């Protein structure tokens, strides 16, 4: 496995050609009005079509243009995972920067790739002198297991803009 920080010239639409985002979701976490959590039986499938792949590529380019970073994992020459960390500080004390993407191709999940990419983002966030990483994470069971095992907790301060985009996501933070 080869891990590296990408350059903007690496971000061509073909980079994501073989990336398989497909995932069957059977359970997802939900919050009750009183703040308690429960695991809800639910079924849906997530996948990216060609239009979404192009949007992701453009989103990653935008991350670069704003001074952010994109990290990738390759199995030989095939992209099998990527993570992006923005470079815009926010929060009441400008303590957060956002982990805007962390995705692993279907065939390579549960092999430690996500952990390595997340740790690369932690190192970069520390280099940038951030105090916390903000994550708008899928509420699906597998994503929550991952982020909680990495030490993420429900955020202390909601980013209203990000929340409005993803109201069913769990808004989390990782304290650096």
Language model regions located:
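Acetyl-CoA-dependent GNAT
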Residues: 9-11, 18-95, 100, 105, ...
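Conserved acetyl-CoA-binding loop-helix of GNAT-fold acetyltransferases
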Residues: 101-104, 110-123, 148-149
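Short beta-strand "wing" residues that participate in macromolecule-binding interfaces
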Residues: 85, 154-155
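Conserved GNAT acetyl-CoA-binding A-motif
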Residues: 125-138
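C-terminal "cap" of GNAT-fold acetyltransferases
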Residues: 136-140, 144, 148-150, 157-176
């Amino acid at each position: 496995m080869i891990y590296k920080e990408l350059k903007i010239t690496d971000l061509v639409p073909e980079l994501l050609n073989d990336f398989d985002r497909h995932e069957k979701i059977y359970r997802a976490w939900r919050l009750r009005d009183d703040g308690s959590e429960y695991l809800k039986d639910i079924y849906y499938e997530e996948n990216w079509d060609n239009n979404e792949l192009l949007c992701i590529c453009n989103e990653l380019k935008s991350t670069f243009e704003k001074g952010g970073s994109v990290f990738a994992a390759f199995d030989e020459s095939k992209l099998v995972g990527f993570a992006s960390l923005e470079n815009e500080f926010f929060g009441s004390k400008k303590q957060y920067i956002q982990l805007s993407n962390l995705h692993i191709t279907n065939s390579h999940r549960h092999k430690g790739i996500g952990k390595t990419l997340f740790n690369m983002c932690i190192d970069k966030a520390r280099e940038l002198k951030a105090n916390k990483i903000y994550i708008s994470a899928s509420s699906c069971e597998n994503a929550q297991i991952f982020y909680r095992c990495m030490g993420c907790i429900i955020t202390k301060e909601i980013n209203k803009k990000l929340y409005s985009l993803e109201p069913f996501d769990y808004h989390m933070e990782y304290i650096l």
